[in-house]
């Protein structure tokens, strides 16, 4: 698949470093070239349908209306 245009401004290229599968939702950690980790929570079904595996190159797309913040 080739993306020719998209309206999401915040995009991070990276490589999947870890996938924590849950029964319904899974966490996917993507490491950017600068070493930052972007974590996405998506459905486990989407992980399977997208063929996501550790080591796969991906693009994380972040829409401002879908960003959550947690304390650490």
Where are these regions (language model features)?
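Non-catalytic connector elements of ABC transporters
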Residues: 1-72
